[in-house]
Regions:
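Basic, Lys/Arg-enriched alpha-helical interface segments
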Residues: 1-77, 86-90, 96-134
Length: 134
């Protein structure tokens, strides 16, 4: 498992998880920038704020999903799922455009799979933190 640095600041560092050439969070962010530029700008501002000042205490922007998973969210429906690691590291699994009130179970399962893969790789000392974007 690789993790690519996406953003960094005094409050935390945000990494995107990847497995070889597969980096779902980066794919999501690239698509969001192209297909939903206004919402992507809001998400980018939220990530900037989180790195510089810490997570907002507003459930409209950051929400817990259970099992150690969280989401950055915009009003327009962009969701970026992540979890914490030591040393104020945020690891993003993937993102999606939410269209219903509840988070689809398939999205939660995908995030849980990435989290488990990361934890397994970390316990085997097989995680690479890469400071350059994917």
């Amino acid at each position: 498992v690789e993790s690519f640095l996406y953003q960094s600041g005094p409050a935390c560092r945000i990494y995107l998880l990847a497995d070889g050439s597969n980096c779902p969070a980066e794919d999501f962010l690239s698509q969001a920038a192209y297909l939903h530029p206004d919402e992507f700008a809001k998400l980018t501002k939220l990530l900037d704020h989180s790195c510089d000042h810490g997570l907002p205490k507003n459930k409209q922007k950051v929400n817990t999903l259970g099992d150690g998973l969280f989401e950055f969210k915009t009003i327009g429906g962009l969701r970026l799922i992540w979890f914490w690691d030591a040393n104020r590291i945020i690891l993003c699994t993937h993102g999606f455009l939410k269209k219903r009130q509840t988070t689809p179970s398939g999205e939660l399962a995908t995030a849980a799979k990435w989290k488990k893969a990361y934890e397994t790789a970390k316990s085997a000392n097989k995680v690479r933190f890469i400071e350059d974007p994917p």
